[in-house]
Amino acid sequence: MSTVRESWLKPKKNIQTNLGDYEDMDKISRLPDDLLVKVLLFLPTKIAVSTSILSKRWEFLWMWLPKLEYHNTNYSASEEQRLRSFINLNLQLHRAPIIESLRLKFSLGRSIKPQNIKQWIIIAVFRCVRELSINLFPLYCIENPAKLPSSLYISKSLVILKLKDQILVDVPRMAYLPSLKYLLLKRVTYKDSNSLHQLLSSCPVLKNLVVERDEYNHDETLSITVSSLQRLTLKISRGGSFDELVINTPSLKYFKLTDYLGECETELDDDSYSYVFKDMPKLEEAHIDSTYPDIGKFVRSITSVKRLSLCVKVNAEEALYREGICFKQLEHLKLCPCDSNWSKLLARLLKDSPNLRELEIKLNKDHKASFDDPACLENQLNYVVQSSIPSLERFTWTWIYGSQNEIDYLEKLKKRLLLTNWQNLV
């Protein structure tokens, strides 16, 4: 084992000699093993392994580490081969009774193959891994996504699972993850349209879900149905065949939705998709960044929020949402002014938020400010200046630039609403 370790690390002789000379005066080495292992936890795995050359006292301490991380970033072909041999030999001999965390980040196709990843995951699951993070990307575009072992989907110990990029999600029928609370799926490939549903159905205590759907996913519907879920973050490529977003999460407290156009997509008139949102009575915070114009379809599900951030497309000719909807608990509102009719949305939200305390107008990252139609802006202003929100304490305007009409608009709002805290950043 020592030969494999040294061939991976390749320590320089003069460094090894200096460290050996320093051994007699090394006070840290006198600490108990469990304390030294805690010290090693602050180091990257490769550096922690390199401490084995310090002395016999340190030779196998790293093998008690409960957290391991391996990657082949900027590795040559020969270095990859040594790393693969090192993991093959040492992971199965690792001395920690439980592997709390295993993180693997590899490019596939040269020395590291899908079967290597599969074998390492099998070992980790057998050792009761609690956190597993797999990030795979192809060295060559022709590489197929890696299929993970079936044992992963029946792990009783797994609490956190993160899967990214070149991974095939193929969920067996007996899948059951009784301890999984955090699940991240970014740009993965699903075996079929039912794979995500099968995976979510196997997680009875799931609390936090992050899903990113890229333009290469051709499923028409993204459906999230998890009764226990409390936090949901979605990033969706809205082009291609994507047609519908369905969310049924009655315990949800935090919701973030972002849609975008992928690199291979262009802006089209029919690139919108439909929302089917079930009631979310416990929702406290929502961030919506979407170009889909039918605001009314999701507003009914977010009326319980205390914090709301919106960047949505507003149709100047249609009503925003039905009368009678009220955001009674809303205290903090953030609005992105990149749509040409943003002032219409602001006017309506001010009317329907009687307990609003903080109002923030801020351009989202990578968004471009729009210039409202002067007539539309004036109409909205005439309505808003008649409003009174005594609860409002702070109005923040963070913007790159704005038209004179928009600046005047916000100045009048400030004066009318008698704000006690005003910040105007141009």
Swiss-Prot record:
LRR repeats lie at residues 50-75, 80-106, 160-187, 188-213, 221-259, 265-290, 311-337, 338-363, 373-399. Residues 25-71 form the F-box domain. Keywords: Leucine-rich repeat, Repeat. It comes from the Eukaryota. The keyword Nucleotide-binding does not apply. The keyword Repeat applies. This is Putative F-box/LRR-repeat protein At4g15060. It comes from Arabidopsis thaliana (Mouse-ear cress).
